[in-house]
């Protein structure tokens, strides 16, 4: 029996592998599985800056949302949205062991910050930032859209197809870098999804074409 591993299968292994690497750390931290959380936060570290102010958190009430409350919300009901970070030596830098009030200057200095609110709600960030989270989701959903449109696709998209989908993310990121505006997690989510889908659709279509040619040999 001549069995060939299809490249599209490797695509799914890679994309879903990245997805699970992203969601395991906060869930493990919430379940107090500190070693597992530490391992997966460290695995994600080379892939992302992991700034908590630019990340989504999984909270102990089952909700997913911004780790850092917006300034508008904080200003309106500041007494209800007092929050601070708590780190453990297994999950973060040893010099920040214990509890301390949130300081914007400390953002990104460690990986598994614990956001706590004074209404007993707390959570941990995903393994990667909000934009990377969206990119991973876009990579996963791209094959589904390809499958739906497969009968209408006559050839592999040009590389400019992928480049066009990167433009919104590039504009958002460059504008923030140059100080024209401060992006939000919603904008990072939208532009990341667009970029992830464009890259995923382009790569997946190429892999499908290669697999078809391999089967014809």
PLM feature spans:
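Short, charged juxtamembrane terminal tails flanking transmembrane helices
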Residues: 1, 211-217
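Membrane-interface helix-boundary motifs at transmembrane edges
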Residues: 2-4, 148-156
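N-terminal signal-anchor transmembrane alpha helix
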Residues: 7-35
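Small-polar-interrupted transmembrane alpha-helices in polytopic inner-membrane proteins
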Residues: 14-21, 138-142, 157-177
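Extracytosolic (periplasmic/ER-lumenal) interhelical loops and adjacent juxtamembrane/interface segments
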Residues: 31-126
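Interfacial helix-loop-helix junctions of multi-pass membrane proteins
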Residues: 32, 121-123, 170-196
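Hydrophobic alpha-helical transmembrane segments
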Residues: 128-146
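Hydrophobic cores of alpha-helical transmembrane segments in multi-pass inner/ER membrane proteins
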Residues: 138-139, 193-209
């Amino acid at each position: 029996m001549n069995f060939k591993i299809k490249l599209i299968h490797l695509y799914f292994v890679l994309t879903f592998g990245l997805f699970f690497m992203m969601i395991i750390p906060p869930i493990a931290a919430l379940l107090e599985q500190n070693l597992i959380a530490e391992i997966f936060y460290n695995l994600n570290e080379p892939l992302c800056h992991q700034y908590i102010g630019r990340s989504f958190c999984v909270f102990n009430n089952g909700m997913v949302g911004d780790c850092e409350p917006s300034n508008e919300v904080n200003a309106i009901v500041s007494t209800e949205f007092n929050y601070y970070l708590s780190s453990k030596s297994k999950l973060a830098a040893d010099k920040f062991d214990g509890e301390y009030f949130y300081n914007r200057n400390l953002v990104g200095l460690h990986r598994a910050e614990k956001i706590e609110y004074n209404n007993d709600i707390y959570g941990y960030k995903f393994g990667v930032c909000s934009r990377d989270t969206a990119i991973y989701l876009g990579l996963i959903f791209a094959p589904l859209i390809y499958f739906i449109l497969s009968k209408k696709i006559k050839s592999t998209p040009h590389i400019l197809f992928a480049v066009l989908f990167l433009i919104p993310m590039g504009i958002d990121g460059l504008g923030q870098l140059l100080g024209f505006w401060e992006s939000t997690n919603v904008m990072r989510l939208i532009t990341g999804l667009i970029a992830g889908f464009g890259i995923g659709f382009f790569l997946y279509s190429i892999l499908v074409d290669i697999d078809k040619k391999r089967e014809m040999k």
